Amino acid sequence: HFNYMLPFFKDSRYMSENNKPLMVIYIPNLIRKLDKMLALWTKMAKENGFDGLTYIYQSAASSFDSSWNKGLFDYGVEMNPGYVGMYFNKKSRGAFPKLMKYSREIKRLLGIKRSLNLLEKNLGVGKCDYDEMWQKVLQLRPKVDCGVKMIPCAVTDWDNTPRHKERGWAYINATPEKFKQYFAQLVDNTKKYYETDMIFVFAWNEWAEGGYLEPDEKNGYALLDAIKAV
């Protein structure tokens, strides 16, 4: 992975902090010997003229899983919409992150490729209000955990029914105009409360989950224009 990323790290356009290129890892607590892997990558980065790497993790479940060492990372991403849902639902912040972690391991060991939840299928597509989600996102205040600084995350939309059909869920009332309004407020919050000038956006091209900034036939470049305007 490091050797693949190295040409990008050396590109002058690649984001870096104090001569440490950014390296984002999704659900790092699933990686065996994570500490040794990051130590090796840091060593390799220094051998290639950098002062190390800036490590960032992203995963709602990872954020609330206390069983792994977040101190290996410089930043964590408030990976919305999952993060805000777990933040305001204390019941899901206990066993759920660990279940997410170990259920993947169990499925891998047993060779299970799909999991079926008949109850969810019978309930049909879930619907959530876009405005309500954003109001909660704007209430978030970063908490430094193990020295890890948090990065806020904006959400364009969510609809994972293309992937999960009846078992999926989607936001209602999402528009580019609302996204622009809420994104502007998130920028203000970032300046006031967060120890970073970065904001992550869900997402660039998660078409199967309804979160994307890429232009489409319905809204054209409206979401990209919203960010540009802010």
Name each model feature, range by range:
Residues 2-8, 12, 28-47, 53-56, ...:
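Extracellular zinc-dependent metalloprotease catalytic-domain scaffold
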Residues 2-31, 197-206:
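Active-site groove signature of glycoside hydrolases
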Residues 20-22, 50-53, 146-149, 194-199:
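Loop/turn elements at helix/coil->beta-strand transitions in domains of secreted/extracellular proteins
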Residues 21-32, 119-132, 167-177, 209-216:
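The substrate-binding groove and active-site-proximal loops of carbohydrate-active enzymes
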Residues 40-173:
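Aromatic-lined glycan-binding groove of carbohydrate-active enzymes
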